[in-house]
């Protein structure tokens, strides 16, 4: 069976006051107005200062780019009508979570009641990319293998160096905040989809979860859609960055699928090993070293990303995403979102200017 590597892209935006630059709990007025235009493609999140958008099922990155561009434009325009702005980054540089309101909804009340401060403080913004797989059995085997590459793409996406008025020293502090949740991070290897389903059934049977959406791993075979969902990235400032990461995930899936058709596969490394690289990516972004487990040695992250681009090169043109993949080279040249935020802060000396930079970058390429 030929697999169609369809795409779905979800982004979470911060809502900010243009005067104070603080996060603003807006009682979902932006969401209600946006749903009249985009229906369920715009949703509320647990904190009122967050707006989530999502594309439909897209055939390629070109279609996904168009939809994300339109969604950013619409949400920005409607925020402006409320006297507010939107921004795309993994964390807000200085607002405190204690001041933000929780959206009134039974699901969010249940999560807050269960997870307490871990949930209330989870004021973060991510990018989720879905890649279509019509076979769940195939999806679990591809997910096992593609886990190795998650830190590489994550390093490129790092966009949350600041938290509550502090330079955290991390390029992505968002992931450190989310680590407080259960069932997060890099998942284990599952030998089959039955193996995975039995794990989910056990958690439900033992009242750990009521459905598989409460498994918040960095990658998961989605419980309701025919997709592998990649959840590791910070929300990117630029649409170009979002599409680059989307293309990387799509190409990795297509490449591993192609190898499988040739009776070959990439090694499925343990969670413990991949976690080591994830921590390095969170701390240093693309400026550190990751471990090449095959060679058992440290390698400059930028060099490993170039190796990744070589690895997927034979499927890029088949998928029609060459321009999006080429943008990875610009990120290596210009720095990640975190690098650029840090540069703005170093130059200006204040976080308000960083917020202005984030909100302006968010709208580049956004159009009706």
Task: Indicate residue ranges for each PLM-predicted region.
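C-terminal accessory/tail domains of diverse enzymes
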Residues: 1-82, 111, 178-368
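An acidic- and aromatic-residue-enriched active-site/binding cleft used to recognize and process polar
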Residues: 18, 84, 89-94, 127, ...
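Acidic/histidine-enriched active-site and ligand-binding environments that engage anionic O-linkages
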Residues: 76-90, 154-159
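Short, glycine/charge-rich beta-strand/loop segments that flank catalytic centers
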Residues: 83-100, 164-168
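Short, low-order "capping/linker" segments at domain edges
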Residues: 97-109, 169-184, 277-278
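Acidic, His- and aromatic-enriched active-site or binding-groove loops in soluble protein domains
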Residues: 105-126
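Internal, well-ordered domain-core segments that constitute the primary functional module
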Residues: 120-146
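An exposed, glycine/acidic-rich loop-and-rim segment of catalytic or binding clefts
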Residues: 135, 143-190
